[in-house]
């Protein structure tokens, strides 16, 4: 599976598992460390942990291995590193506070399922 399909597959998995405000950001021109970031919110720490576990398990089925995971133990922000793209899973209040979309030069937007910037 190519990178674009991997990213789309993860976005689909997040949507199917009730993640909210899913956003894909192209950061290739802003950093040399990753090409894309997927940002999504969950309704509780249990929900974002479940989202992270499902994302990692489904990625493995497609032979996509995560390099690392930060914040899985009861955190309100979990980061999954897939090498050339990252997945940020956060509680809405944490996402609003850190507003990493704006930090990377993008304005926050309200979306129903997914949106690409």
Question: Model segments located where?
Answer:
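Catalytic metal-binding acidic patch
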Residues: 35-37
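Short hydrophobic/aromatic beta-strand micro-patches
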Residues: 39-41
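Active-site beta-strand termini and strand-to-loop segments that position acidic
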Residues: 80-82
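Polybasic/polar functional segments that serve as interface/processing modules
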Residues: 1-33, 45-78, 92-93, 100, ...
């Amino acid at each position: 599976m190519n990178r674009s399909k991997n990213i789309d597959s993860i976005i689909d998995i997040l949507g199917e598992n009730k993640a909210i405000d899913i956003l894909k950001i192209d950061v290739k021109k802003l950093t040399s460390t990753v090409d894309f970031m997927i940002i999504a919110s969950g309704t509780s720490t249990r929900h974002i942990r479940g989202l992270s576990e499902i994302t990692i398990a489904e990625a493995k089925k497609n032979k996509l291995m995560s390099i690392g995971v930060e914040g899985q133990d009861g955190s309100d922000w979990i980061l999954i590193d897939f090498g050339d793209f990252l997945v940020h899973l956060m509680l809405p209040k944490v996402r609003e506070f850190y507003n990493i979309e704006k930090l990377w030069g993008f304005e926050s937007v309200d979306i129903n399922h997914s949106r690409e910037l």
